[in-house]
Each structure stands twice: as C-alpha cells, then as structure tokens.
Amino acid sequence: EAASTGSMGAAVVPARHGLKTRPAMELVDDLRRRYLDLVRDSLTGILNEDPALEERVGGGRNPFDRAKREAGKDWPASALSMIGAKRMLQLQRASEFVIERGVSGDFIETGVWRGGACILMRAVLAAWGVTDRRVWVADSFQGLPEPDAARYPKDAGNMLCVFDQLAVSADEVRAGFARFGLLD
C-alpha cells in the first residue's frame, strides 16, 4: 500500500492493524537521525564501550571512559575513529549544513587513521540520498612521519611517529567502509 497525502499535503505512512503512524517526512527525519547516531556511536566505540588502545597495549584492563571517548582523548582499541563523539557530531552537522544549503563539492579527509570520519561523511551522504558527491580519503597509510623541528618548531619532541598503531593500510580503511555497506 502506498503512502497517501494528508490534509496538509504531507505524505502519511498508512496505518497497519490499527497502529497510529506519523507523517512520512517526520518519520524519515527520525530514522535518518537514529541511523547517523548509531553510525557515530559505532565508529567511536561508544556503542560497545571499546576500551582505549593504551590499556590493551599496556596489558591493563581499565574500564571504558565515556568522557574521554566523547572528547577524543583516547585511542580506541578497535573502533574506527579517534576524534571522539563531539567532533564526530560536529562533522555530521557540517556535512548536513552544506547538503541542506546546496553547497557544491566533494568531501575529503586528510590523515584518516582507520577511516571513521570519512565513513561518517559517506553515511551522511547515504542518509540524505546524495549521489552526486564523493568522499575522498588522503593518507600515506604508513603512520606519522618523524617531526621536522627545524621547519615546525612546535613539533619538537612529538614522538607519535613511533606508534605502529597509527599506520593503517588502505585495505583496512576500505574494509571499514565495507563493514558499514558504504564502500563505493
């Protein structure tokens, strides 16, 4: 049975077995929000309370710290993003802003780690039914380089280059997109 038009011209999902239903656009907006909430929480490891990587590497078993994960203050052991829930929500809102206002262009992330932020951008495009944009992924896929303190004095002493966990292959990133059904 197809959706009908309500008294105000809005599509209404037909009632089944006496169930009360909502206007179709309200339902679509709610389902889009729920889907993107679920994707964000999964990508950050909040959904399954993924412990921080340093606890796993160090052999300890500290409990999941939601406040740290929301702020992006830890590296998840298996989740696909380290930027935290607050930044992921901001990224979603920024992506939706340009879609809603018709700003043209593709999306890109430079330095993707496991690909979580670009997977979210791709999920936003899918949730909004956008088919004329791409999400570009740019990375060396070799981890971080040694700091060049001569050119970038503020990088002196930064030793993130020693963490092998930051080197994630392009195939691993593609696999992350595929796990969410978003690999093009």
What residues fall within each predicted segment?
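S-adenosylmethionine/decaboxylated-SAM
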Residues: P23-L36, S42-A85, R101-D184
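Short, low-complexity intrinsically disordered segments enriched in A/P/G/S/L with frequent Arg
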Residues: A3, V13-A15, L19-R22
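Extreme N-terminal basic, low-complexity initiation segments
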Residues: A2-M8
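Conserved alpha-helix/loop element of class I SAM-dependent methyltransferases that forms part
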Residues: Q90-R101
